[in-house]
Amino acid sequence: MAKYRAGRINEEVKKEVSNIIHNDIKDPRLSAMVSVTDVDVTKDLKYAKVYVSIFGNEKAKEESLQALKSSVGFIRKEIGRRVKLRNTPEVIIEVDNSIERGMHIDELLHSIKENESNDN
């Protein structure tokens, strides 16, 4: 039973954090495309790790990450207002590079396939 509740809480917090980032944070440094890939709330609801994927050049990524990290207080306050939980979790922003790694692997597989077709 607790597994399902944790999953529902993770999804609800993920949805709200995504809405907050895209609609409510007015930081000009948040210029790159940012997407929330996953949220992991601890069982005691004290911490919420928010995994974000940031697209853009390295400078835009760093600026966007700094903007998100400086907005964690606002994000936490909005989560507390929007999601009905006994404790509002402390938000921890983590960068998720899995999408970029997946794209890199896809490019490698595509180049291998091209090399094999050229050899035949």
From Swiss-Prot:
UniProt keywords, alphabetically: Cytoplasm, Ribosome biogenesis
UniProt-listed GO biological process terms: maturation of SSU-rRNA
Annotated signal peptide: none
GO cellular component labels: cytosol
Keyword Nucleotide-binding: no
InterPro entries: KH_dom-like_a/b, RbfA, RbfA_dom_sf, Ribosome-bd_factorA_CS
Stored Pfam families: RBFA
Subcellular localization: Cytoplasm
GO MF, one annotated term: ribosomal small subunit binding
Similarity comment text for this entry: Belongs to the RbfA family.
Assembly with partners or alone: Monomer. Binds 30S ribosomal subunits, but not 50S ribosomal subunits or 70S ribosomes.
Function statement: One of several proteins that assist in the late maturation steps of the functional core of the 30S ribosomal subunit. Associates with free 30S ribosomal subunits (but not with 30S subunits that are part of 70S ribosomes or polysomes). Required for efficient processing of 16S rRNA. May interact with the 5'-terminal helix region of 16S rRNA.
Protein name (record): Ribosome-binding factor A
Organism name: Clostridium botulinum (strain Okra / Type B1)
Gene transcribed to yield this protein: rbfA
